[in-house]
Amino acid sequence: MSMSDPIADLLTRIRNAQMVAKPTVSVPSSKVKIAISQVLKDEGYIDGFQVKTEDGKTELVITLKYYAGRPVIERIERVSRPGLRVYKASASIPQVQNGLGVAIVTTPKGVMTDRKARATGVGGEVLCYVA
């Protein structure tokens, strides 16, 4: 079965796994999902991730992070979706919770946080908000 929005599927799997306090979550792998996972790791929202290949299928295994028994990610939501793409210039990329959260943006220079996109002066598609 084909998936219409694989990024939304990744975010939903992370959200659902954290609600039941799972230590890891597995999703089908892609370059964009790996880049999003790298941003989440760099920002301290997940402990890490691994790419595993089994029977010709690559799978991304994300190790979730908890603090005092509660998930570090309080809110993770998709912004740009297949039916309504959201593009922003570098100056108009929104701040999430007055800078406490991050917006993950895909730009011509790769997937990065809203702060890095503003600092480098590039805009792009706003994939999701994480807080």
Swiss-Prot record:
Organism: Variovorax paradoxus (strain S110)
Gene this protein is translated from: rpsH
Swiss-Prot/TrEMBL keywords: Ribonucleoprotein, Ribosomal protein, RNA-binding, rRNA-binding
Record-linked Pfam families: Ribosomal_S8 (PF00410)
Family: Belongs to the universal ribosomal protein uS8 family.
Described function: One of the primary rRNA binding proteins, it binds directly to 16S rRNA central domain where it helps coordinate assembly of the platform of the 30S subunit.
GO biological-process terms attached to the record: translation
InterPro entries (UniProt xref): Ribosomal_uS8, Ribosomal_uS8_CS, Ribosomal_uS8_sf
Keyword Acetylation listed: no
NCBIfam families documented for this protein: PRK00136.1
Subunit note: Part of the 30S ribosomal subunit. Contacts proteins S5 and S12.
Any one GO MF annotation of this record: rRNA binding
Gene Ontology CC: one annotated term: ribosome
Name of protein: Small ribosomal subunit protein uS8
RNA-binding is among the record's keywords: yes
Lineage top rank: taxon: Bacteria
SUPFAM superfamilies named in the record: Ribosomal protein S8
